[in-house]
Curated annotation (Swiss-Prot):
Keywords: Ribonucleoprotein, Ribosomal protein, RNA-binding, rRNA-binding. It comes from the Bacteria. It comes from Shewanella loihica (strain ATCC BAA-1088 / PV-4). This is Small ribosomal subunit protein bS18. Binds as a heterodimer with protein bS6 to the central domain of the 16S rRNA, where it helps stabilize the platform of the 30S subunit. NCBIfam families: S18 (TIGR00165). One of its GO terms (biological process) is translation.
């Protein structure tokens, strides 16, 4: 049987030494939402709980200010 080796998940924000996730940083936030607009869970991305909470808060603020869409385009 072949064994599959998964890449170890790590928190990018901890590695880079980020103190606060900013809602205006749309390029970073887009990496953590799906095509349909859902927030990707930390078990998929490997983000720490502290940064996952900040990430969710930043995404919700960006959505409220219409910097990010709530859903996809519904075509």
């Amino acid at each position: 049987m072949a064994r599959y080796f998964r890449r170890r998940k790590f928190c990018r924000f901890t590695a880079e030494g980020v103190t606060e996730i900013d809602y205006k940083d749309i390029a970073t936030l887009k990496n953590y939402i799906t095509e349909s607009g859902k927030i990707v869970p930390s078990r998929i991305t490997g983000t720490n709980a502290k940064y996952q909470r900040q990430l969710a808060r930043a995404i919700k603020r960006a959505r409220y200010l219409s910097l990010l869409p709530y859903t996809d385009l519904h075509q």
